């Protein structure tokens, strides 16, 4: 949300409870300082001010994909093209590609120029559409392990053609001896 808020050019303050405001934001802080934008984080909140501009952005490829996704959502809305250079290693490629797939469904496109550089054409707009959010393989891992041990568990909403890296849990469980069948987006475990 931070880069999206920076499309307004206005001061925006994010607040939260508990430890939420203690989460490290150094990735964005560095980026904002390079852009001469205001970025102030305190226990009371996080304030950003100033507008992102089209151009070249550099970000470590081994940071949380959430930082990369934030820029992917915002940069195509700027009036000019931007490039996002990810400094290797790029550790969350599947999550970056998931973000790009969702964007494409809503009419916003980007493309890989090479293994670490994305081109984000500017001047795009998100268009409304009907979209089915697929199940989360990471969250499904817990009941999947239960099913592998006890059997009698069916998990629905797990797209077989997903880009989620955590879908590997099914292969891991199969190699450990789990017995399951897949029918569409459902996975049913039998006791091994």
Report each predicted region and the residues it spans.
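Short, structured segments at the rim of ligand-binding sites
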Residues: 2-192
